[in-house]
Swiss-Prot record:
Domain of life the protein comes from: Eukaryota
Biased composition (Low complexity): 9-24
Pathway assignment: Protein modification; protein ubiquitination
Source organism of this protein record: Saccharomyces cerevisiae (strain ATCC 204508 / S288c) (Baker's yeast)
Effect after changing residue 354 to S: Abolished zinc-binding and folding, leading to impaired protein import into peroxisomes
Location of the region described as Disordered in the Swiss-Prot/TrEMBL record: 1-24
Transmembrane segments: 34-62, 68-92, 137-168, 172-208, 278-305
Residues bound to Zn(2+): 334, 337, 354, 357
PANTHER family to which the protein is assigned, alphabetical: PEROXISOME ASSEMBLY PROTEIN 12 (PTHR12888:SF0), PEROXISOME ASSEMBLY PROTEIN 12 PEROXIN-12 (PTHR12888)
Other observations noted: Present with 907 molecules/cell in log phase SD medium.
Recorded GO CC terms: peroxisomal importomer complex; peroxisomal membrane; transmembrane transporter complex; ubiquitin ligase complex
UniProt keyword annotations, A-Z: Membrane, Metal-binding, Peroxisome, Protein transport, Transmembrane, Transmembrane helix, Transport, Ubl conjugation pathway, Zinc, Zinc-finger
The protein's name in its UniProt record: Peroxisome assembly protein 12
Length: 399
């Protein structure tokens, strides 16, 4: 992941851009490469599909009950709820989303342009991120809306659009009370394409290093991308007094508790480090596992297709059919009248006979084939007329 962070920015050598400030230096050194952002967005979109794949193929398939089925049915709802808590924690703590943080990405507020330019010019700006460039509450809410709420609403609207489209295909009646559905079919795809085009234009501006935003909402609310930097605290004065008191402390319960708390504070940092190492590995293993299972399923399907292509054995024939097959010219003669077939039809057993002969024979012989003597499924007995009837036992041939 750190490979992309070490790539030189294409806009660092450009001068006189719209983001330029003092001495011709702009905000280009702050922006990451487009590869980092696209990789992060791709993983963010693949993560729910991968988790649902594991849930459906292992938990639901091995333990099918009403709880696991409901868990799979309402997957998008509870997954978005959990993701919302995780994303809000990371936005509040790190000014970054869960996936972006593992790619070394961070969001900052570009409303104070002079402070951002000072951060580029000041060599010490690489050490910590000032409070004025951190996201405010409104900008964090916008990112939460873009990452959590809007994808959920879009997914539900896509489902409604698909249902309405399918209903219009299979139902031809159009009444006046369906005008909201017709308006939705016209307006929603147009708005969706318009937003996609707007996001594409913002990405083109990002490629030209005119902005650090990659979406329309980020561009409107002055939210831009940068690489991860430590955030400065509002109470930075406490850092100067920390560690100055080297006097002996009293060994009472409070001091012992404070000492243990200080020693245990390393656990969250350790868990964060392990998570940063485990998450990329988990994503890689998950993709390999999906590829492996897909290849295995493809092999099984190909094997089944090959088994179907094998020669199908002929069905067993009765002694009467064997005698009939030995007769000369049986393939061109009707098995009932033993003459040349006129007005041909085919029976369920695959043999051809004259249509009048076949009807007469089947009715008088309780629906049995004249060649194999097998009962035809298309011949039924009518209890009202006390006669056998040919329903679907034969088919006319057009020659």
């Amino acid at each position: 992941m750190s490979f992309y962070s070490n790539l030189p920015s294409a806009g660092q050598s450009s001068r006189g851009s719209s983001t330029s400030g003092r001495n011709g230096v702009g905000l280009e050194p702050l922006y990451p490469t487009i590869f980092e952002i696209m990789s992060s967005q791709e993983i963010d979109s693949l993560l729910p599909a991968s988790i649902r794949y594991l849930l459906a193929n292992h938990l639901v398939a091995n333990f099918p009950n009403r709880y696991t089925l409901r868990l799979n049915k309402y997957f998008f709802e509870w997954f978005q709820a959990i993701k919302g808590f995780v994303e809000w924690y990371h936005l509040k703590t790190y000014n970054s989303t869960f996936i972006d943080r593992f790619y070394g990405l961070q969001l900052f507020s570009s409303r104070d342009r002079n402070l951002a330019l000072t951060q580029c010019l000041n060599p010490k700006g690489q050490s910590e991120w000032p409070q004025g460039l951190q996201l405010n509450q409104q900008q964090k809410s916008v990112i939460f809306l873009e990452k959590i709420i809007l994808p959920y609403i879009t997914a539900k609207l896509d489902e409604i659009l698909e249902k309405i489209s399918m209903n219009n295909i299979f139902s031809s009646d159009e009444t006046e009370n369906k005008w909201p559905k017709r308006a939705f079919l016209r307006i929603y795809p147009f708005i969706k394409k318009l937003l996609a085009l707007s996001n594409l234009l913002v990405k083109l501006l990002f490629l030209t290093k005119r902005t650090g935003s990659v979406s329309l909402l980020q561009y409107l609310f002055k939210i831009e991308y940068t690489t991860v930097r430590p955030l400065s605290s509002e109470l930075s004065g406490l850092k100067e007094t920390k560690g100055m008191d080297n006097r002996l402390r009293k060994t009472n319960i409070s001091s012992i508790f404070a000492l243990m708390q200080g020693q245990l504070s390393i656990i969250p940092r350790f868990l964060t480090f392990m998570g940063s190492q485990f998450f990329p590995t988990f994503i890689f293993v998950l993709r390999v596992y999906q590829w492996w299972t897909t290849q295995d399923m493809t092999t099984k399907l190909q094997k089944r297709v090959n088994d179907l292509d094998e020669d199908i054995p002929r069905p067993p024939f009765s002694s009467h059919s064997d005698k009939t097959e030995d007769k000369e010219g049986v393939s061109e003669a009707c098995p009932v009248c033993e003459k040349t077939v006129q007005n041909p039809c085919v029976l369920e057993t695959g043999y051809v006979a004259c249509y009048p002969c076949a009807i007469s024979y089947l009715v008088n012989n309780e629906g049995h084939c004249p060649v194999t003597n097998k009962k035809l499924l298309g011949c039924t007995y009518n209890k009202h007329t006390n006669k056998w009837e040919v329903v679907t036992g034969i088919r006319k041939l057009l020659i």
